[in-house]
Amino acid sequence: MSEGTPNSTHFGYKTVESDQKADMVAGVFHSVAAKYDIMNDVMSFGIHRMWKRFTIESAGARPGMKVLDLAGGTGDLTAKFSHIVGDKGQVTLADINDSMLKVGREKLRDKGIVGNVNYVQANAEALPFPDNHFDIITIAFGLRNVTDKDAAIRSMLRVLKPGGKLLVLEFSKPKHDVMRKVYDLYSFKVMPKMGALITQDAESYEYLAESIRMHPDQETLKGMMVDAGFEQVEYTNMTDGIVALHKGYKF
């Protein structure tokens, strides 16, 4: 999917200046942060938990590892990784949006998840971490909101250790026509109404639906990861391709 001209990009279906998108996306997530977890459960009928569980299982994390949960938001994956890597490991929850980080930090601390988790406000396109630092990086439902996806993927490659794994969990393209039609109807007619009802913000959920449609499809994203330098790149479709999990290694 085209990212626009060199100085422009997509914000949903709109074309905007590249340097404006980050602030516009930030506005969306500042607006929805407090109700983000509730909306995830309502909009996906709870299925997002199954998608995330599969991602955790596919990551193959072990005690003592360093994990980066990028665009980690309210910390669903961080919570699971924290238990897996244990006291000798470390999980970094990074997000560009301070409102999402605040919600995630408070939620995990309320659950008693402290000690091996740290929180960093970071832009995926220029990660503030040393080279060859993490064993595993996950980015769940975040890549589509990044202005320069290619730069972000290269940045993730840089901070992975040799032998490390990147997992990208993201909305993608349904494989069958019937599912595509149902999904479009749900995304553009139902989601904004639920957003208005629960968060009093239909516009943000209109953007989220549009951003999903503008995101690269399964094969395009696979090619982007290969072009960045990842090896053994593959993906698994879930729920008929509504969501796909891409995996790639750094060697």
Swiss-Prot record:
The gene is ubiE. Pathway: Quinol/quinone metabolism; menaquinone biosynthesis; menaquinol from 1,4-dihydroxy-2-naphthoate: step 2/2; Cofactor biosynthesis; ubiquinone biosynthesis. One of its GO terms (biological process) is menaquinone biosynthetic process. This is Ubiquinone/menaquinone biosynthesis C-methyltransferase UbiE. It catalyses: a 2-demethylmenaquinol + S-adenosyl-L-methionine = a menaquinol + S-adenosyl-L-homocysteine + H(+); a 2-methoxy-6-(all-trans-polyprenyl)benzene-1,4-diol + S-adenosyl-L-methionine = a 5-methoxy-2-methyl-3-(all-trans-polyprenyl)benzene-1,4-diol + S-adenosyl-L-homocysteine + H(+). PANTHER family: 2-METHOXY-6-POLYPRENYL-1,4-BENZOQUINOL METHYLASE, MITOCHONDRIAL, METHYLTRANSFERASE. It is an enzyme of class 2 (transferase). S-adenosyl-L-methionine binds at residues 74, 95, 123-124. Methyltransferase required for the conversion of demethylmenaquinol (DMKH2) to menaquinol (MKH2) and the conversion of 2-polyprenyl-6-methoxy-1,4-benzoquinol (DDMQH2) to 2-polyprenyl-3-methyl-6-methoxy-1,4-benzoquinol (DMQH2). Keywords: Menaquinone biosynthesis, Methyltransferase, S-adenosyl-L-methionine, Transferase, Ubiquinone biosynthesis. Its EC number is 2.1.1.163, 2.1.1.201. It holds the Pfam family Ubie_methyltran. GO terms for molecular function: 2-methoxy-6-polyprenyl-1,4-benzoquinol methyltransferase activity; demethylmenaquinone methyltransferase activity. PROSITE patterns: SAM_MT_UBIE, UBIE_1, UBIE_2. Belongs to the class I-like SAM-binding methyltransferase superfamily. MenG/UbiE family.
